[in-house]
Amino acid sequence: MACGLVASNLNLKPGECLRVRGEVTPDAKSFVLNLGKASNNLCLHFNPRFNAHGDANTIVCNSKDGGAWGTEQREAVFPFQPGSVAEVCITFDQTNLTIKLPDGYEFKFPNRLNLEAINYMAADGDFKIKCVAFD
């Protein structure tokens, strides 16, 4: 998959927050934020789908270990709107990643790779990143 943004050597530690803010395109179908060790070792594949892959207004999360996808987790809460600005905050520990959505709703996704640091981020799709911050 071609990526709009790829960053490496992030060294995000447990408890630190990764904030990603950007604009959802007016004709958005989906976008992706991938976090992990490398492109084939992802602790989080975060994929809000407006209308893509048979899903509508659904957030699909997954992990990838050595290139093999895990089991998808779906979230029905969908605060994203085409043509709007959105911010997502992601923190993690040894057990879970916590994803805070633009409306303040939080959900957890298991840290299946047991990563102690997140060094890789990639973004793609119908989301123009304006700011990436570490808190």
UniProtKB/Swiss-Prot annotation:
Subcellular location: Secreted, Extracellular space, Extracellular matrix
Residues with PTM N6-succinyllysine: K108
Domain of life: Eukaryota
Signal peptide annotation: none
Transmembrane domains' residue ranges: none
Amino acids binding a beta-D-galactoside: H45, F46, N47, P48, R49, H53, N62, W69, G70, T71, E72
UniProt xrefs under InterPro entries: ConA-like_dom_sf, Galectin-like, Galectin_CRD
Keyword entries, A-Z: Acetylation, Apoptosis, Extracellular matrix, Lectin, Phosphoprotein, Secreted
In-chain residues carrying the UniProt-annotated modification Phosphoserine: S30
Name of protein: Galectin-1
Function text: Lectin that binds beta-galactoside and a wide array of complex carbohydrates. Plays a role in regulating apoptosis, cell proliferation and cell differentiation. Inhibits CD45 protein phosphatase activity and therefore the dephosphorylation of Lyn kinase. Strong inducer of T-cell apoptosis.
GN (gene name): LGALS1
Biological source species: Pongo abelii
GO BP terms: apoptotic process
